[in-house]
Amino acid sequence: MDHSMSKKLHDEALLHIVGGVNSPSRSNKGVGGGIPVTMERASGAYFYDVDGNKYIDYLAAFGPIITGHAHPHITEAITKAAQNGVLYGTPTKHEITFAKMLKEAIPSLEKVRFTNSGTEAVMTTIRVARAYTGRDKIIKFAGCYHGHFDLVLVEAGSGPSTLGIPDSAGVTKSTAEEVITVPFNDFASFKEALAVWGDQVAAVLVEPIVGNFGMVAPEDGFLEAVNELAHANGSLVIYDEVITAFRFMYGGAQNYLGVIPDLTAMGKIIGGGLPIGAYGGRIDIMEKVAPLGPAYQAGTHAGNPASILSGIACLEVLQEEGLYERFEKYGSMLKDGIEKAALKHGIAVTVNQIVGALTVYFTEDPVTNYAEAGATNGELFGRFFKGMLEEGINLAPSKYEAWFITSAHSEADILETIQAVDTVFGKMVQDN
């Protein structure tokens, strides 16, 4: 494929934008470098770049675009918002409608509040949990991404009984020491951490199904055990459903798994492609939020009509009968096709697939936690990513990210993708 215009634009972007991108994940650093493709437009399941190339898209903007690009119902809602004014700074009837829709879909949300992003939503749930419990520390799980605010840019210390250390320049040591990080799916380590720090732990922050070191499901009984022990300790349980809300069913991963948290943070899908976040939970906890309580959260754009109307339209689309069954069907088809192609060419892969989301790891071993994901072959993934791009398939540029199937993908798209995988695996073997 010709990418000459993408290269020209990236060279220009480097002169004006830090690193040439507005989020590090877009830089292709995770696939060994190279020029990121600049997109011109998107429609349905397809991307079109500035050089005129067409791609089947599984990036889905890192998750939000579950209905495909430029869905007509969502486009109509955004157009209506633009015509009526996109920002008021006052209450609107639409935010009530949307709050009711979220509560009906995810019953643990007894009260909700809107923010501008998933990062803001997670950040505020931690503040609210601290206000409710009178404690300061949180426990989180290694490799789970919860946004880019200081408190969650923390990696594990030397073990479950040690405090965290900064994972980014600019995060202070004192901030990192408010966080204990333990391996996902490792209840023994969680139990040890709580035994040491329990009376200081305000909340346990969990991705109920991990989406940030690939798609990784909790082992049987893990979330239930975490809930039980956290509550026995007087700590709250926060589910970060920024990726998972409405991903696997019309509702949250908590509905899908049957395990209920005290607070939930959401984003991505619920905005229909526009910036949004939301959080909610038990009434007695949520009433700690201003103006009813002492935990402050505000935002100029929070609850803006454009994002709210886009979100309402997105959830209306997701109520289509049989949609999630189709996601499951296509997800299973992709997993099966990738595994068969890998076996044919003698390439070791593990495919973690949950409904319409999956991750292809270059390893023969299971992946159930961050350390196992980190041990997979990133060099092979980088070659695979670039090969798929040349075959007209757009993936996330990192071995840790997921493929997302949207309502716009057809069975023909899935079959074309499987054929591309077979072609790329063949070239990878030939190149060796």
Swiss-Prot record:
Its EC number is 5.4.3.8. PANTHER family: GLUTAMATE-1-SEMIALDEHYDE 2,1-AMINOMUTASE (PTHR43713), GLUTAMATE-1-SEMIALDEHYDE 2,1-AMINOMUTASE 2 (PTHR43713:SF1). GO terms for cellular component: cytoplasm. It catalyses: (S)-4-amino-5-oxopentanoate = 5-aminolevulinate. GO terms for biological process: protoporphyrinogen IX biosynthetic process. The modification N6-(pyridoxal phosphate)lysine is found at residue 268. GO terms for molecular function: glutamate-1-semialdehyde 2,1-aminomutase activity; pyridoxal phosphate binding; transaminase activity. Its cofactor is pyridoxal 5'-phosphate. Pathway: Porphyrin-containing compound metabolism; protoporphyrin-IX biosynthesis; 5-aminolevulinate from L-glutamyl-tRNA(Glu): step 2/2. Homodimer. It is found in: Cytoplasm. Disulfide bonds: none annotated. This is Glutamate-1-semialdehyde 2,1-aminomutase 2. InterPro entries: 4pyrrol_synth_GluAld_NH2Trfase (IPR004639), Aminotrans_3 (IPR005814), Aminotrans_3_PPA_site (IPR049704), PyrdxlP-dep_Trfase (IPR015424), PyrdxlP-dep_Trfase_major (IPR015421), PyrdxlP-dep_Trfase_small (IPR015422). Pfam families: Aminotran_3 (PF00202). Belongs to the class-III pyridoxal-phosphate-dependent aminotransferase family. HemL subfamily. Keywords: Cytoplasm, Isomerase, Porphyrin biosynthesis, Pyridoxal phosphate. It is an enzyme of class 5 (isomerase). Its main location: cytoplasm.
